[in-house]
């Protein structure tokens, strides 16, 4: 009985997401524009040039090509990591760049197939390398770990490092800056 309930739950969720996706696509085609949320702070994927206020990067090239292929105009909407996925749910924009897949996020938004795989990595100063030879070395009382608010790395750090002190950093500040300033021993990021 429990499996049957779960099956129906997933059918309803997936059907609802499919209907929403179809209506969103219809709206994009009717309005002639696709709104894309991006942070503009993840080099080389999405970067905002402060001198021109234009966005560049690998993911920007992808959404430019998508808009061209669809025959619609591209509208870039600045966002932050903490609201990246919520912007889709709240209809602030139609799609986003750089949103890592997680089970929680998949309950409210649809995802395409990944075009590359990320790994989560810890980064620290060279003089700390002998202290941090493994993930377990980071998961200790007294160790300070910086992560960016709203990222999958934030969620991972909460699970992997329950004994460490987490410094959750809100953009536009960067978690690696906490390490450079001596306010954190390591930061958790992707391998990009």
Give residue spans per PLM region.
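Extracytoplasmic small-molecule ligand-binding "clamshell" domains
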Residues: 22-99, 107
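Ligand-binding cleft/hinge of the Venus flytrap
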Residues: 46-52, 63-72, 134-139, 153-170
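Hydrophobic residues within well-ordered alpha-helices
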Residues: 66, 88-89, 138, 178-180
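Short beta-strand-to-loop elements that line the ligand-binding cleft
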Residues: 73-80, 147-148, 164-172
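A ligand-binding cleft/hinge motif common to bilobed small-molecule-binding domains
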Residues: 83-86, 99-108, 155-159, 176-192
């Amino acid at each position: 009985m429990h499996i049957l309930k779960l099956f129906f739950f997933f059918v309803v969720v997936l059907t609802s997401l499919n209907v929403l996706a179809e209506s969103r696509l219809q709206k994009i085609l009717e309005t002639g524009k696709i709104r894309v949320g991006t942070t503009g702070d993840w080099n080389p994927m999405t970067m905002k040039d402060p001198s021109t206020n234009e966005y560049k990067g690998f993911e920007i090239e992808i959404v430019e090509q998508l808009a061209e292929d669809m025959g619609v105009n591209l509208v870039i909407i600045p966002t932050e990591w903490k609201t990246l996925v919520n912007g889709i749910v709240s209809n602030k924009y139609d799609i986003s760049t750089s949103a890592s897949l997680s089970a929680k996020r998949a309950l409210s938004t649809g995802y395409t197939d990944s075009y590359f795989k990320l790994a989560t990595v810890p980064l620290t100063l060279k003089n700390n390398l002998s202290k941090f030879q493994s993930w377990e070395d980071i998961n200790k009382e007294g160790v300070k770990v910086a992560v960016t608010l709203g990222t999958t790395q934030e969620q991972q750090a909460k699970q992997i490092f329950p004994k460490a002190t987490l410094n959750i950093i809100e953009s536009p500040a960067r978690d690696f800056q906490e390490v450079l300033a001596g306010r954190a021993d390591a930061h958790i990021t992707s391998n990009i």
